[in-house]
Design a protein with these regions (language model features):
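Glycine- and acidic-residue-biased ligand/ion/polar-headgroup-sensing regions
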Residues: 99-101, 105-111, 116
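Bacterial N-terminal signal peptides
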Residues: 10-19
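Bacterial N-terminal signal peptides that target proteins for export
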Residues: 1-10
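Conserved short histidine dyad/triad with adjacent acidic residue
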Residues: 65-70, 82-97
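Short acidic-glycine-tyrosine-enriched beta hairpin
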Residues: 117-133
Length: 196
């Protein structure tokens, strides 16, 4: 099962990476400043979401995520790849990404996915393709955290993630609602959240 998950993740990364590039035979040699990476499950840039003052649920606690591949991690200028967990009963709030397609690979658990105008319950090993500008919301319906992999076809959202988080091991200071609103305004090209 782990081999299948690893192969599926590699296939997703290959698909996203190659779909956003047009390469001629003369350009086939890696001339970018990207660095090949081999990472274990818990390796990468570990960060914790900063809680938002006065928020409830997931936005009120520092949740972990790992940025694995982007401009700062491996030097990729074409995609963003990372992992995150959704605690039981919590949701990734309804949002959309104007500038990038996204793929979510739910590695375990039981979730309700609202995607555009469709809703479906899915279980571990489910893949969700989210075209740019499509509304998405994911709710953990199970009793254990859901682990998922995310891949973006273009950079941008990782900058929002860094702005709203703290590196693991550093003091976590809550965001005020004004700070959260300013960060969302600055990164509106990468993510837009639905009004509560």
């Amino acid at each position: 099962m782990r081999t299948l998950k690893a192969l599926t993740t590699c296939a997703i990364l290959t698909l996203v990476a190659t779909s956003s590039l047009t390469v001629t035979a003369d350009e086939a040699v890696n001339t970018s400043k990207a660095t090949p990476l081999i990472l274990e499950k818990n390796e990468g840039e570990k960060r914790l979401w900063r809680p938002i003052e006065g928020a409830k649920g997931w936005n009120a606690v520092p949740g972990p995520f790992i940025l694995k591949v982007d401009r700062h991690n491996g030097g990729s200028s074409h995609l963003v790849f990372g992992t995150e967990d959704i605690p039981p009963g919590e949701s990734i709030d309804r949002h959309r990404h104007p500038g990038a397609d996204e793929i979510l690979f739910l590695q375990n658990g039981h979730a309700r996915v609202h995607l555009g105008d469709r809703t479906r319950e899915v279980h571990g090993d489910a893949t969700v393709f989210i075209p740019a500008n499509t509304w998405i919301e994911v709710t953990n319906l199970g009793t254990e955290p859901i682990s998922f992999v995310f891949v973006f076809s273009a950079p941008g959202f990782e900058n929002f993630m860094r702005a709203e988080s703290t590196p693991e091991g550093q003091k976590i200071t809550p965001l005020t609602k004004a700070e959260d609103a300013q960060i969302q305004k600055e990164h509106g090209h990468a993510v837009i959240y639905a009004e509560p």
